[in-house]
Amino acid sequence: MIDEALFEAEEKMEKAVTVAKDDLGSIRTGRANPGMFNRIGIDYYGAFTPITQLASINVPEARLVVVKPYEASQLGAIETAIRNSDLGVNPSNDGNLIRISVPQLTEERRRELVKQAKSKGEDAKVSVRNVRRKAMDELSRIQKDGEAGEDEVGRAEKELDKTTARYVAQVDELVKHKEAELLEV
């Protein structure tokens, strides 16, 4: 029971870190990057579909992204979704594909994005800590029900604390890396 609780907690913490990676990857830096478009989608036959599944996204130059829809009929919808996103870019449609010139970030916008990255990192750490709290509750329940002794539960709690610290450190590292990437001119 204890091993199951620890394994489940670690799995959930891993998912929280993965979500944090995705969230931080969607924050645009001064360079063109296909990951910028992971969170942008359109209504495609009644279902929200990310544009990464509807088009090929290439980066031929450091500040240029080319989006080529698999279906020409989706060109306008994809262009509108990109324009309405919070990326702050202005796509140009030539009838076959969409070109997006990624402008240089202003100092003010960089600081805004760093705050956003820190906020997303803090959300991920809260998520990891919530998983820890639920696992601790589960360990207490196991001890109370007499399924494990106090020593076993104590060791499991120490192991859980180490695991939590490891995942919180991973999130901190991701945020630090993103911050350095954003502040790099």
Swiss-Prot record:
One of its GO terms (cellular component) is cytoplasm. Gene3D superfamilies: 3.30.1360.40, Ribosome-recycling factor. Residues 141-160 are annotated as: Disordered. Keywords: Cytoplasm, Protein biosynthesis. InterPro entries: Ribosome_recyc_fac, Ribosome_recyc_fac_dom, RRF_sf. One of its GO terms (biological process) is translational termination. It is found in: Cytoplasm. GO terms for molecular function: ribosomal large subunit binding. Signal peptide: none annotated. It comes from the Bacteria. Responsible for the release of ribosomes from messenger RNA at the termination of protein biosynthesis. May increase the efficiency of translation by recycling ribosomes from one round of translation to another. Belongs to the RRF family. NCBIfam families: frr (TIGR00496). HAMAP family: RRF. This is Ribosome-recycling factor. The gene is frr.
